[in-house]
Regions:
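Short C-terminal tail/terminal secondary-structure segment
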Residues: 3, 143, 232, 243-256
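Short, small/polar-rich loop/turn modules that mediate ligand/substrate recognition or access, typified
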Residues: 170, 175, 242-244
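Conserved glycine-rich cofactor-binding loop
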Residues: 6, 13-15
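Residue(s) in the substrate-gating loop at a strand-loop-helix junction
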Residues: 138
Length: 256
């Protein structure tokens, strides 16, 4: 379905981003990976799916590096047809105790990077009259949770950016939608599980159940693979008139 198209996925060396990158690769899209940590492993996983893969290590808090990444992708593959804004970090603290530098970093990486990547991708998408921007927001783009002020603010901003981007391109072949996962057992969430296990003096498995029980009625983690299939749908002809939605995959979290 996506042969001869290129997908750039930020924050894609692990977790949700890698799951989405692999799902798009299975549909034939060439992939530009971005992120920190192990790079060769994810590249090998994508190559094994029979597509081309490239990597750019842009720091998503730095606009100049984002611009370099977008230029790199265009030079390597012609243009970015599918942009998945997934890069994200987390910090937990009460508002009055929240470190200012952590606030600034979360807003920069979780929200502002999506703006910069989108503004740079849209002109070529519009020229081709086809493009997909998929913003990985969060259930926290729809509801709040205590001690996550920066993350919740950023993800609400991502949902707002999604709506505006969709409206501005509504008469073109360029769509923009957001994915809003509940709990996904990524390295980011595993840190929260570990902290809860220590705080409660329980096993890691018990801490996972406590975490799910607080918010997610299904008592199941959403998987990167499931989120990847939703991204594939957003890239399919069936989604041509799906524009500006914030699609939650959250086990019933916001239905309560």
């Amino acid at each position: 379905m996506l042969a001869n198209k290129t997908a750039l996925v930020t924050g894609s060396t692990s977790g949700i981003g890698l799951g989405i990158a692999k799902a798009l690769a299975r549909q034939g899209a060439n992939i530009v990976l971005n992120g920190f940590g192990d790079v060769e492993g994810p590249k090998a996983e994508i190559l094994a799916l029979g597509v081309q893969v490239a990597y750019h290590g842009a720091d998503m808090s730095k606009p100049a590096e984002i611009e370099d990444m977008m230029k790199f992708a265009a030079e390597r593959f012609g243009r970015v047809d599918i942009l998945v804004n997934n890069a994200g970090i987390q910090h937990v603290a009460r508002v009055e105790d929240f470190p200012v530098e952590k606030w600034d970093a979360i807003i920069a990486i979780n929200l502002t990077s999506a703006f910069h990547a989108s503004r740079l991708a849209i002109p070529a998408m519009r020229a081709a009259n086809w493009g997909r921007i998929i913003n990985v927001a969060s259930v926290h783009g729809l509801v709040g949770s205590a001690e996550k002020s920066a993350y919740v603010a950023a993800k609400h901003g991502v949902v707002g950016l999604t709506k505006v981007t969709a409206l501005e391109n509504a008469t073109s072949g360029v769509t923009c939608n957001a994915i809003c996962p509940g709990w996904v057992l990524t390295p980011l969430v595993q840190k929260q599980v570990d902290a809860k296990a220590v705080a409660l003096g329980v096993s890691n498995e018990e801490a996972k159940n406590v975490l799910l029980g607080e918010k997610e009625p299904s008592m199941q983690f959403t998987t990167p693979e499931e989120l990847g299939e939703l991204a594939v749908f957003f890239c399919s002809p069936a989604s041509n008139n799906v524009r500006g939605v914030a699609w939650n995959m959250d086990g019933g979290w916001v239905a309560q």
